[in-house]
Amino acid sequence: MSGLAGAGAGGRLRVAVVGATGAVGTVMLRLLGSRAFPASEIVPFASERSVGRVLDGGLVVEPLDDETIGGFDVALFSAGATRSREWAQRFVDAGAVVVDNSSAFRRVDDVPLVVSEVNPEALDAHCGIVANPNCTTMVAMLPLKALHDAFSLASMVATSYQAAGGAGQSGIDELAAQIAPLASDVTQLCEDGATAAGKVTHAVHAATLAFNVVPLLGTLGDDGHTDEERKLRDESRKILGIPSLAVSPTCVRVPVMVGHGVAVRATFEREVDLERALSALAAFPNLVLDDLPTPLAYAGRDEVAVGRVRLDLADPRTLNFFVVGDNLLKGAALNTVQLAEALVARGLVGARASAA
């Protein structure tokens, strides 16, 4: 089996990365190296068309089959829900702990849904699979947890501004291909937008995204909400441990390559003291206060940034803020690797290696 030996000085863990050639999987591989994860071997897996491809560091993509998945301590998945449902439990049965970045297991009761800074103690109850939250939920959780601990969260209204990269590399590529044809005629953009939009095709996003805002992403349900919006509600409840949390979500796609933003109106059980709220946010790990947080400024950065923090004009128990984060890093790959690190630190993986 082709892999990278000795990744992490003194490491003894064998790590599989499933979906290694995708946008998130590529970042996972980079982070495993840059963060010196204690691995003796890292093996990339991907679709059949990528098998045999040589990645950075000389890693060679392996096929997913019962002959190749044995003997791993940790398996990091970012290959979509269908692939996760098919293969995650098989990795577990072969001895690995799986950290899954898809939606496959997030709503399963006995699968922990974890943000590394928010609820790492949930890892202790895992039965072989740990779920990574949706990238939009992830970005919002850090400030919400800090404020929940201070004032007890009761409800929230959240509007997301989600980057094209939330749809994967194909989402980025589609936006990039639309920019030049539309930018070539600014007058048409201003005076006949429908004709301008018709000059390009779209298949990934619900409408032409360049120079536009698209208030629909995900699958629309009978109640008028998309599955992306339901994820934001359901995952927030599970991660924060507030089953009755009232969430009113709206998810919007914006013409940004990487970096999600969320405007949040959070209402608490207690009256909010602004200075105490700012102190709680400033003290929270991996969260920075920024007067003007923008997705572009935080693309490629590990931190989540929160700003425009202000008391509501109508309700003293309500706080408004805007939060941004890189959807490929903290929103996906970084949290996945952080969860693997936390599993190791808590002694929850490596039994096979220890017994060897």
Regions found by a protein language model. Name each.
Residues 285-303:
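Conserved PLP cofactor-binding pocket of PLP-dependent enzymes
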Residues 274-284:
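Short amphipathic alpha-helices in soluble, non-transmembrane regions
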Residues 253-255, 325-330:
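Glycine-rich phosphate/pyrophosphate-binding beta-alpha loops
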Residues 250-255, 293-296:
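Short, solvent-exposed loop/turn elements at beta->coil junctions and helix N-caps
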Residues 201-251:
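Oxyanion-binding "anion nests"
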